[in-house]
Amino acid sequence: MKRFITYVVTSLFAFNFGVSASALWPWSSYSTEKPASLPAVPLIPATPALTESNITAPVPQIVFGGGRLKLVSEEAQLKSQSLQYDIKVRYPHIVGANEPHIQRLNRRIEELVSEQYYGIQHPLKEDLRYYRQRWPEALSELFIDYVVTLATDSILSIYFNAYSYGIGAGTSVQYGFTVNYDLVSGKELKLSDFFQHRANYLAFISRYCTDQLATHKSGEWLHRENLAPVISNFDSWNITRTGIRFNFDEGEVFGCSEGEQAVEIPFAELKSLLSARGLSILRNSSVVGL
């Protein structure tokens, strides 16, 4: 994750579900003072912001893993007036198998999501005292939803989109984080797993993303330093059916008003750089272009 935000709040969040869901979901009730025991898109063009009055249907279930596994949505709705926070998160949970690596993945997802709101639930005493004096009715807010970019027998790739706003801040903040998992080996994937050891793949990714984003209507103001060929600039990525998508948070490559951005590099463009292992993982997933 490119950034970790401790006190952030928003009154809106947006997401896009690959096949059908560009939606938020209805909230029925909140927990009160005591939080639940949870551990807890990128779009081209940028995601339009939605208000809670626009919230519609939940994300549909996804069946994968040869029909054996199912992704269902779990929700956490946490609110405390005394601690001045309002948290709404949704994340995927795998059902249909009890294998240790599936259970580890479920825990990993829950913990990753819960890490995002731990700081909001546990404000410093001096900060809370200040909030109560200056903004007694205000709430820190965090909204998180997810996009599944690929779910096959061998790969699960998930993008989490977060909108947050901190008490006293002038505007909300968008940021994203990802999980890319090899269901065959039972391990989380790193970007380097797909490329030849000596291949200068970061230089290629940097150049490709820079060229694509430079054609944007705000290309003149592209933050090129954030596209330099270093791994930290490309640590938010997902596998899709047709390529590897690189996600850039709001304000990372353009001004904040342009929203979050993403660039997908087709597998055909990457093929000469891919390692034997990378090719094997991708071909087992029946992706297009290899």
How would you label these PLM feature ranges?
Residues G18-L290:
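Compositionally biased intrinsically disordered regions enriched in Thr/Gly
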Residues L12-F13, F17:
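Hydrophobic core
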Residues M1-F4:
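Positively charged n-region of N-terminal signal peptides that target proteins for export
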